[in-house]
Amino acid sequence: MSGLGQARRVVVKVGSALLVGPDGAPHADWLADFAADAARMRARGQQVLVVSSGAVALGRRRLGLARRALTLPEKQAAAAAGQSALMRAWEEAFEPHGAACAQVLLTRDDTEVRRRWLNARATVETLLGLGVVPVINENDTVVTEEIRYGDNDRLAARVAQLVGADVLVLLSDVDGLYTADPRKDPAARHIPRVPRLTPEVEAMAGGANAEGGVGTGGMATKIAAARIAAAGGCATVITLGSRTRPLAAVEGGERATVVEPATTPAAAYKAWIAGSLAPAGALVVDDGAAQAVRRGKSLLAAGVRRVEGRFDKGDAVLVRDEAGREIARGLVRYEAADAERICGLKSEAIEGVLGYTSGPLVHADDLALAAHAEA
């Protein structure tokens, strides 16, 4: 089982070879089939995000660039020219299903610099809440080699982490991982499930690289992406993208490789908060707030007695009781000066004091309990 039918949130990576034909024009029929596939999932309450290559390939045609290796300025120019054509193709595909698309362009800093990560996550969450299909791509127009993801397989894995996706689908030119390259070795065996990524699995992927003429990713990059996704609690499905309605095909039992996650998305996120971020300050809370946090509730301003340290919105902070015991760590939604101004206030009074509200001081989703603090 791929888990695709049960997933709440699915990220699908679509490569250039599926989207763009040899003549440099969009594959309109494939896009229409894929949109119908995604619309079927959306109709049963699932959220679908698309990580889409293709801007540079489409831009080549519009700018008349020869099919050769491009310089970085040429690639950036092609991306700028092709991105609008790419979005138009996606919009035309989803329009018959009443679904709006939205363009989201990212660089590596957007998923690795914490404040930008929070902003990117908030934007994508808002789009999903509005019923929009986010179409995400690397911002090739401005990106440099130092801040590139390198390929859209890795970008898709980072997006899966960003949004807490349950399943990442990597549409490939082969139907999964094999013990050797099946195009060269007739004895190669398909591997339907990878419970854990090992050096042996990665060695198999290194021998099964795709040799397409448009995109940049091969099987090794897909396994590298699966490792990123697994650490974030997301399963990865690698399957043949050229099938009619490839998502339905996977659900129907067509051949694919499923890389199982190491944990759940929520647990991975909480572990990241608890173990990877240095606290910039602390919020000292009363007994009622301490008990609420222990029960998995958000930390409201009304229960905060004191603010310690200097921190910005999105920084990690400690949550301590009045005896100095650490209860939790979390990502705060207000900078320190504003947090001090709203200490002890009820939620409905915050906007009148600050002129805005960002909800609770620390949302329950962004709180990781200390080991001894379980309710």
Curated annotation (Swiss-Prot):
A GO molecular-function annotation: RNA binding
Pathway: Amino-acid biosynthesis; L-proline biosynthesis; L-glutamate 5-semialdehyde from L-glutamate: step 1/2
Binding site for substrate: S53, D140, N152
Keyword ATP-binding among record annotations: yes
InterPro entries: AceGlu_kinase-like_sf, Asp/Glu/Uridylate_kinase, G5K_ProB, Glu/AcGlu_kinase, Glu_5kinase, Glu_5kinase/COase_Synthase, Glutamate_5-kinase_CS, PUA
Catalytic activity field: L-glutamate + ATP = L-glutamyl 5-phosphate + ADP
Residue span, PUA domain: 280-357
Group of enzyme by EC: transferase
Intracellular or extracellular location(s): Cytoplasm
First-listed, main subcellular location of the protein, grouped into a coarse class: cytoplasm
Pfam family, one: AA_kinase
Annotated residues for binding of ATP: K13, S172, D173, T216, G217, G218, M219, A220, T221, K222
Entry annotated with the keyword ATP-binding: yes
GO biological process, one term: L-proline biosynthetic process
Keywords assigned: Amino-acid biosynthesis, ATP-binding, Cytoplasm, Kinase, Nucleotide-binding, Proline biosynthesis, Transferase
EC number of the protein: 2.7.2.11
Cellular component terms per the entry's GO annotation: cytosol
Function recorded in the entry: Catalyzes the transfer of a phosphate group to glutamate to form L-glutamate 5-phosphate.
Family: Belongs to the glutamate 5-kinase family.
HAMAP family linked: ProB
Protein name: Glutamate 5-kinase
Gene that produces this protein: proB
